[in-house]
C-alpha cells in the first residue's frame, strides 16, 4: 500500500492539505498504540508499526518537494538523498548570483526592504517551479519533473537562507 492509498487519496501531486490532515488525525486516532494497550504483543507491535507508517507517510505527503520525490520514486526514479550534480549551468549561475545578491543585502541602505523584495522574487520563482513540477508529473514527464525537483530543492534552500538573514537583520 503506497502513501496515497494509506490516506485514501488519489496518487497525484496536487492534494487537499486539509483533507490530508483530517485523514491523518483519523488514522492516528484509530491506530494509536494506546488503543492496543490490552491487546496481544503482536497486535501492539503492529499498531506501533502502523502508527510509524502513518506518521512517515504524512510527513512525505505534507511537503510538496518530498511528495514529488515520492511520486517519482513510485515511477522508478529515486532522487531522494541523491548526490547528483546539477547539469544546468544557466540555473547554477543564476543560483550563484542570487546567493551573492542575498549576501549584499546586509550592506544596503534599507536592508529590510531589499530582503522583502528579494524574498518576493525567490518566492515567485519557487511557485513557478512548483507549478511546472505539477504539470510535468501530471503529464508523466518523469525525467523533466526530476530535474525540476532538483532545481526546486536549490530554491527551497535559498528560501531557508533568506529566513536566516531575516533573523539576523531583525535580531
Swiss-Prot record:
**MF annotations from Gene Ontology:** ATPase activator activity; protein-folding chaperone binding
Q: One Pfam family for this entry, by name?
A: HSCB_C
Q: Which PROSITE patterns match?
A: DNAJ_2
Classification via SMART domains: DnaJ
Sorted alphabetically, the Gene Ontology BP terms of this entry are: [2Fe-2S] cluster assembly; protein complex oligomerization; protein folding
**Assigned keywords, A-Z:** Chaperone
Q: What does this protein do?
A: Co-chaperone involved in the maturation of iron-sulfur cluster-containing proteins. Seems to help targeting proteins to be folded toward HscA.
- PANTHER family, per database record: IRON-SULFUR CLUSTER CO-CHAPERONE PROTEIN HSCB (PTHR14021:SF15)
Q: What is this protein called?
A: Co-chaperone protein HscB homolog
Corresponding gene?
A: hscB
Amino acid at each position: 500500500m503506497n502513501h496515497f492509498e494509506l490516506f485514501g487519496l488519489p496518487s497525484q501531486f496536487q492534494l487537499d492539505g486539509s483533507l490530508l490532515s483530517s485523514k491523518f488525525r483519523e488514522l492516528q486516532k484509530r491506530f494509536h498504540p494506546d488503543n492496543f494497550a490490552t491487546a496481544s504483543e503482536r497486535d501492539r507491535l503492529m499498531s506501533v508499526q502502523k502508527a510509524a507508517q502513518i506518521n512517515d507517510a504524512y510527513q512525505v505527503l505534507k511537503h510538496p518537494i518530498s511528495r514529488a520525490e515520492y511520486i517519482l520514486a513510485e515511477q522508478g526514479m529515486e532522487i531522494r538523498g541523491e548526490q547528483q550534480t546539477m547539469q544546468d549551468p544557466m540555473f547554477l549561475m543564476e543560483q550563484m548570483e542570487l546567493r551573492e545578491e542575498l549576501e549584499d543585502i546586509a550592506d544596503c541602505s534599507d536592508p529590510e526592504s531589499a530582503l522583502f523584495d528579494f524574498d518576493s522574487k525567490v518566492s515567485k520563482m519557487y511557485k513557478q517551479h512548483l507549478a511546472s513540477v505539477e504539470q510535468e508529473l501530471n503529464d508523466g514527464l518523469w525525467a523533466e519533473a526530476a530535474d525540476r525537483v532538483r532545481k526546486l530543492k536549490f530554491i527551497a534552500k535559498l528560501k531557508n537562507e533568506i529566513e536566516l538573514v531575516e533573523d539576523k537583520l531583525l535580531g
